[in-house]
UniProtKB/Swiss-Prot annotation:
GO molecular function, one term: medium-chain fatty acid-CoA ligase activity
Protein's UniProt name: Medium-chain acyl-CoA ligase ACSF2, mitochondrial
Function, as annotated: Acyl-CoA synthases catalyze the initial reaction in fatty acid metabolism, by forming a thioester with CoA. Has some preference toward medium-chain substrates. Plays a role in adipocyte differentiation.
Family classification: Belongs to the ATP-dependent AMP-binding enzyme family.
Top-level class of the enzyme under EC nomenclature: ligase
Organism expressing this protein natively: Macaca fascicularis
Cellular compartments annotated: Mitochondrion
One Pfam family in the UniProt entry: AMP-binding_C
EC number: 6.2.1.2
Gene name per UniProt: ACSF2
Length: 618
């Protein structure tokens, strides 16, 4: 057996340690001889050994590369759906309990073809952007797959967005079409759109001309006839003609797996959302690799029934949920339009669910249901918990009380399609409770000591960086911000502070920026601070995250009023309603007269956070 220097990226690591200015900078160059010596002490392994083993860090340094035993897939989403529909045509593909819809893979493929053909028939073309704005539903899954089938780029729009937030994302990517339900609960989608696009009421369907949204020409209503809109059923009917189905088949011949397929918005430190753009290649392979980590290929059809309470506009829901089910012929079960702990338990019991996806907050709510013990959860086997840090006691409760012995703790970012680290199902409870698992196949990770400018020692905190097939194409229309996030050697800087141990387990210990993760939602203080500064009584405001047993973190706005002004926390919360998403409204509003400062006058947010937690008795 020929020896090789392929041991988990050793040659790449050697080049990194050589001090390329584009990678580690000048300080790394000074450490070249030291790091090379560390590498020389590592035994070379054969290619077969590399593929058979669990990847380990190299040379006592925080660098690891996932195995490459299985080839990456060069398929579009449409080709994957076609393959699964041919392989298991009569297996249940989708169950929407709220709408009482059930489809087999053959039926889903037929509906997706009609929807994709229909979108082309109303004038949308390959590369056009279409926004999907609404809660979890059959229509969401249909549009997700239909846009991919037609080469149209899906823009995932947060269903809680208000008018200004909606306007920003639609203009940012030049959305040509927007799909939404008339309303859900108190969210009046059509009325919100009219605030920024009043022309829709008098427009001919498909021929909208908007002053503030010049790219938007087509508005599609999912469930009700509305002025200026097309009904989704009308789009499907238009796509049923042989002419348009043939047009779809023609277009599919020219789709590439490297074409963009999805834009997901993720906020930046300035508070302005950035459109992370993902390709078929990103999404197909991430869902395939995650399913492999979950060992879905070993499951029987009865064990392939996934309950998905996670939102589809999030990457975990659309990739780890919809796409992974599609890749492995698993049944996707939508328990409710938005998360509801009771509905999730009802879905598990009624549908004989075996896998469950969710954030820590969702699992806390499920476990805290007063009638939890009355549900039959005997069919549960495993699932994924991700989105924000989960305390060890919660991991143990999920495994023991929800019967999820094969639970996997996963970590990722939207920019990485999303999952880059995850446990193996057979990992111990302690390993799952104390880490986010080990590196995924075809993915590299390194932890950088930012002060020294080189790779961190094992068990030493530093910034986590990722490289591989999973890294996004870029931020839509923002090459400068893309360059700040992804360096010339294709390393993506996550902004998360992490450690790696000798076994390759990664632990997220903090964030290099002040992002708040509330129940799986990423919230950036700068965005809220800018918003509160529009209040006439506010002189200054600082927003921090404070600990919360249920949500992980809650938002605390520390407000300094202008001289002579008075107000209340209730007034401030009322000021937020209808202007920012409900999940961004601070739970705590504290009025202060000053902030903790450094000697140079900079606000010390970590000290402010500590002060607020003491003040609030958290």
């Amino acid at each position: 057996m020929r020896a090789t220097a392929a041991y988990v990226g050793m040659l790449r690591l050697g080049r990194m340690c050589a001090g390329s200015p584009g990678v580690l900078g000048a300080r790394a160059a000074l450490s070249r001889s030291w790091q090379e010596a560390r590498l020389q002490a590592v035994r070379f392994l054969s290619s077969r050994e590399v593929d058979r083993m669990v990847p380990l860090p190299v040379g006592g340094l925080s660098y690891v590369q996932g195995c490459t035993k299985n080839h990456l897939l060069s398929k579009t989403v449409g080709r994957c759906l076609e393959a699964t529909a041919q392989r298991v045509p009569e297996r249940e593909a989708l169950v929407d309990l709220h709408e009482n819809i059930r489809l087999t893979f053959a039926q889903l493929k037929e509906e997706v073809d009609k929807a994709a053909s229909g979108l082309l028939s109303i004038g949308l073309c390959k590369g056009d952007r279409l926004g999907m704005w609404g809660p979890n539903s059959y229509a969401w899954v249909l549009i997700q797959l239909a846009t991919a089938q037609a080469g149209i780029i899906l823009v995932s729009v947060n269903p809680a967005y208000q008018a200004t937030e909606l306007e920003y994302v639609l203009k940012k990517v030049g959305c040509k079409a927007l799909v939404f339900p008339k309303q859900f609960k108190t969210q009046q989608y059509y009325n919100i759109l009219k605030q920024i696009c009043p022309e829709v009421e008098n427009a001919q369907p498909g021929a909208l001309k908007s002053q503030r949204l010049p790219d938007l020409t087509t508005v599609i209503s999912v469930d009700a006839p509305l002025p200026g809109t097309l009904l989704l059923d009308e789009v499907l009917a238009a796509g049923s003609t042989q002419q348009h189905l043939e047009q779809l088949q023609h277009i599919q011949q020219f789709l590439s797996c490297h074409d963009p397929i999805n834009i997901q918005f993720t906020s930046g430190t300035t508070g302005s959302p950035k459109g992370a753009t993902l390709s078929h290649y990103n999404i197909v392979n991430n869902s395939s690799i995650l399913g492999e980590r979950l060992k879905l290929h070993e499951k029987t059809p009865e064990q392939l029934r996934m309950i998905l309470p996670s939102p589809l506009y999030h990457c975990l829901g659309s990739v780890g949920g919809t796409m992974m089910c599609l890749m492995y012929g698993a049944t996707l079960i939508l328990a409710s339009p938005v998360f509801n702990g009771k509905k999730a338990l009802e879905a598990i019991s009624r549908e004989r669910g075996s896998f469950l996806y969710g954030t820590p907050t969702m699992f806390v709510d499920i476990l805290n249901q007063p009638d939890f013990s009355s549900y039959d959860i005997s069919t549960m086997r495993g699932g994924v918990i991700a989105g924000s840090p989960a305390p060890p006691e919660l991991i143990r409760a999920i495994i023991n009380k929800i019967n999820m012995k094969d639970l996997v703790v996963a970590y990722g970012t939207t920019e990485n399609s999303p999952v880059t680290f995850a446990n193996f199902p057979e990992d111990t409870v302690e390993q799952k409770a104390e880490s986010v698992g080990r590196i995924m196949p075809h993915t590299e990770a390194r932890i950088m000591n930012m002060e020294a400018g080189m790779l961190a020692e094992l068990n030493t905190p530093g910034e986590l960086c990722i490289r591989g097939y999973c890294v996004m194409l870029g931020y839509w229309g923002e090459p400068q911000k893309t360059g700040e996030a992804v360096d010339q050697d294709k390393w993506y800087r996550t902004g998360d502070i992490a450690t790696m141990n000798e076994q390759g387990f990664c632990k997220i210990v903090g964030r290099s920026k002040d992002m708040i993760i509330r129940g799986g939602e990423n919230i950036y203080p700068a965005e809220l601070e800018d918003f509160f500064h529009t209040h006439p009584k506010v002189q200054e405001v600082q927003v921090v995250g404070v600990k919360d047993d249920r949500m992980g973190e809650e938002i605390c706005a520390c407000i300094r009023l202008k001289d002579g002004e008075e107000t209340t926390a209730e007034e401030m919360k009322a000021f937020c309603k209808g202007k920012i998403s409900h999940f961004k409204i601070p739970r705590y509003i504290v009025f202060v007269t000053n902030y903790p400062l450094t000697t140079s006058g900079k606000i010390q947010k970590f000290k402010l956070r500590e002060q607020m937690e003491r003040h609030l008795n958290l």
